[in-house]
């Protein structure tokens, strides 16, 4: 029986089409150019390389260039989220109907995650925030992130369901025995890599209730 739901935040609890992640992604590139002196025409290549080898741009910059991770996170998330997000009453209603405990499991900082959930009007549904600081910068899909989260939850892996728009983030959850859901939303930035680890595939976050 599923007792706990782990929700990814970005491009999962709101759609990729909102445009919020585009601005954050631009700010990641801007940080590399203006703060680290990376040539503008090489940023995309370096970020793809970090994505493949380390999972995220932050993880790559942290390991290879020893950046101040907190300064980076502050810079890239200094975005007015209300510009992109509005209260989502169907999401609010669906979350209210689901009896399971709910947490956010995100590679973003909790301070930003709270602002996002507040803008969506759904903050009250979430009991815990497993954010990049909780993960000690070992972001998804690093297996240690999942071990940390599971150790903090009052649930076994087989009682957890995890939802993420980045399919490869589901692999470690699946290996631990969680039920996994890939949100294959329009505008998915990462393609289908890892989709074989998804027990279910949904097109919008509103389909979660149907699975449960
Ligand atoms: Mg996401």
Q: What function would you assign to each model-found segment?
A:
Residues 1-3, 96, 103, 109-212:
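Asp-based, Mg2+/Mn2+-dependent phosphohydrolase catalytic module
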Residues 83, 102-104:
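Short helix-to-loop capping/linker segments positioned immediately adjacent to catalytic or ligand/cofactor-binding
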Residues 90-100:
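A short, Lys/Arg-enriched amphipathic alpha-helix followed by its capping loop at the start of a domain
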Residues 2-7, 12-92, 111:
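N-terminal helical cap/lid subdomain that shapes the substrate entry/recognition surface
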């Amino acid at each position: 029986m599923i007792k706990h739901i782990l929700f990814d935040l970005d491009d999962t609890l709101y759609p990729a089409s909102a445009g919020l992640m585009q601005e954050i992604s631009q700010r990641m590139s801007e940080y590399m150019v203006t703060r680290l002196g990376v040539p503008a025409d090489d940023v995309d290549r370096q970020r793809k390389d970090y994505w493949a080898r380390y999972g995220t741009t932050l993880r790559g910059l942290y390991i290879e260039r020893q950046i101040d991770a907190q300064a980076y996170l502050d810079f890239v998330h200094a975005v007015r989220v209300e510009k992109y997000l509005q209260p989502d009453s169907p999401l609010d209603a669906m979350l209210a109907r689901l009896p399971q405990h709910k947490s956010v499991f995100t590679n973003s900082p909790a301070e930003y995650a709270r602002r996002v959930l507040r803008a969506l009007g759904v903050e009250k549904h979430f009991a815990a925030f497993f954010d990049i600081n909780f993960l000690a910068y070992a972001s998804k899909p690093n297996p240690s992130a999942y071990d940390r989260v599971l150790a903090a939850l009052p649930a076994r892996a087989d009682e957890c369901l995890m939802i993420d728009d980045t399919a490869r983030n589901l692999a470690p959850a699946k290996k631990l025995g969680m039920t996994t859901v890939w949100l294959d939303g329009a505008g998915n930035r990462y393609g289908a890599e890892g989709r074989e680890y998804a027990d279910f595939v949904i097109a919008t976050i509103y389909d979660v209730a149907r699975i449960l």
